[in-house]
Amino acid sequence: MDRLLQSLQDRPLLFVGGKGGVGKTTHAASLACRLAALGRKVLVVSTDPAHSLGDVLQEKLSGTARALDDNLSALELDPSRMVDENFAAVEKTIAAYARPEMLPRLREHLEAAKSSPGAEEAAMLEAICRHVVEQRQQGFQHLVFDTAPTGH
């Protein structure tokens, strides 16, 4: 593990991925805790809808970063909330250009689009990018992402 940690110290973004049940969350939490123990400022972010990161860390987490100690913070992103926020922003942009009588129909289309293939993934990708920018500005040296399961 020490060689792995040494090789990761210069990598600000770490994504832990794979199929469900293979230990992604445990591995992401372990990496984050070890890097923090080495004095690195770390944020571990779960994009997994199962929200098990809080269980592994034995902490109650939400969509806002919570400091667990001086060097370690954690949060769990809610995919449904990310989709809602993403589509609300799209609606606001469209509403600025559309005629008022078109808005009810546009809202119907946007609501239907929320369940389209890739909508959740696109919203999560945008949220991840936003967190990368914001958290780097706040001085985090590493962002460790515990990703949603693949292979489904």
Model regions and ranges:
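Flexible phosphate-sensing "switch/lid" loops adjacent to ATP/NTP-binding sites
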Residues: 1-15, 22, 27-152
